[in-house]
Swiss-Prot record:
Domain comment in the entry: Contains 1 copy of a cytoplasmic motif that is referred to as the immunoreceptor tyrosine-based inhibitor motif (ITIM). This motif is involved in modulation of cellular responses. The phosphorylated ITIM motif can bind the SH2 domain of several SH2-containing phosphatases.
Protein name stated in the entry: T-cell immunoreceptor with Ig and ITIM domains
GO cellular component terms, semicolon-separated: cell surface; plasma membrane
Record's keyword terms, sorted: Cell membrane, Disulfide bond, Glycoprotein, Immunoglobulin domain, Membrane, Phosphoprotein, Signal, Transmembrane, Transmembrane helix
UniProt key word Ligase: no
Cytoplasmic side: 163-244
Signal peptide feature range: 1-21
Known outcome of mutating Y225A: Complete loss of phosphorylation
Function recorded in the entry: Inhibitory receptor that plays a role in the modulation of immune responses. Suppresses T-cell activation by promoting the generation of mature immunoregulatory dendritic cells. Upon binding to its ligands PVR/CD155 or NECTIN2/CD112, which are expressed on antigen-presenting cells, sends inhibitory signals to the T-cell or NK cell. Mechanistically, interaction with ligand leads to phosphorylation of the cytoplasmic tail by Src family tyrosine kinases such as FYN or LCK, allowing subsequent binding to adapter GRB2 and SHIP1/INPP5D. In turn, inhibits PI3K and MAPK signaling cascades.
Organism the protein comes from: Homo sapiens (Human)
Pfam families: V-set
Name of the gene encoding the protein in the UniProt record: TIGIT
Length: 244
């Protein structure tokens, strides 16, 4: 009963400005808006340029009444939209769980005194969920790109580790080769160990003996040489004696 009285009273207010012709205010709206399927949207209108008192605001979708906000009785939501329509903020209206069928024109009708009725228009377009579409469309390529990136990173890490180990192994082999060469060179050029005193005497004794034998022969030759000289000198002396 109260619902019917509000509608009748609203119709009476709507006819009032036609007789008075004293409408000076304007309705400011968000104009054309869009929202994603499954989301929510706020329909908002604002009355300006007038000092008239707002007595009631009706929200309608084309020919369907969605909600009424009365200055004295408060909000009343149409039973067919209770699950998806919420009052506010302010004199606005919130649509929830949007579907493609919610696309269309919405009207905010301000009933004022003494100006009468002001009407604002909002066009809502409900779009398919871009998040779901883009997620489904780009999920596989994104996962593929991530997998490829991980493969590249893992390959790079493996290559770096392998090169590092190879360099370390080469350094170790190089150091070992240098050590072996140094040890071999030291063994070749190191002085031989001193022989025992007995062996040294025996080694040096043989040349001495040989030298003694060679000196004996030389001495014998010198002795013979001096004998010849003595013989000759004696011969000369005897020769001088006989001549004298």
């Amino acid at each position: 009963m109260r619902w019917c009285l509000l509608l009748i009273w609203a119709q009476g207010l709507r006819q009032a400005p036609l007789a008075s012709g004293m409408m000076t205010g304007t309705i400011e709206t968000t104009g054309n808006i869009s929202a994603e399927k499954g989301g929510s949207i706020i329909l908002q209108c604002h009355l300006s340029s007038t000092t008239a008192q707002v007595t009631q605001v009706n929200w309608e979708q084309q020919d369907q009444l969605l909600a009424i906000c009365n200055a004295d009785l408060g909000w009343h939501i149409s039973p067919s939209f209770k699950d998806r329509v919420a009052p506010g903020p302010g004199l606005g209206l919130t649509l929830q769980s949007l579907t493609v069928n919610d696309t269309g024109e919405y009207f905010c009708i301000y009933h004022t005194y003494p100006d009468g009725t002001y009407t604002g228009r909002i066009f809502l377009e409900v779009l398919e969920s871009s998040v779901a579409e883009h997620g489904a469309r780009f999920q596989i390529p994104l996962l593929g790109a991530m997998a490829a990136t991980l493969v590249v990173i893992c390959t790079a890490v493996i290559v770096v580790v392998a090169l590092t180990r190879k360099k370390k192994a080469l350094r170790i082999h190089s150091v070992e080769g240098d050590l072996r060469r140094k040890s071999a060179g030291q063994e070749e050029w190191s002085p031989s160990a001193p022989s025992p005193p007995g062996s040294c005497v025996q080694a040096e004794a043989a040349p001495a003996g040989l030298c003694g034998e060679q000196r004996g022969e030389d001495c014998a030759e010198l002795h013979d040489y001096f004998n010849v000289l003595s013989y000759r000198s004696l011969g000369n002396c005897s020769f001088f004696t006989e001549t004298g």
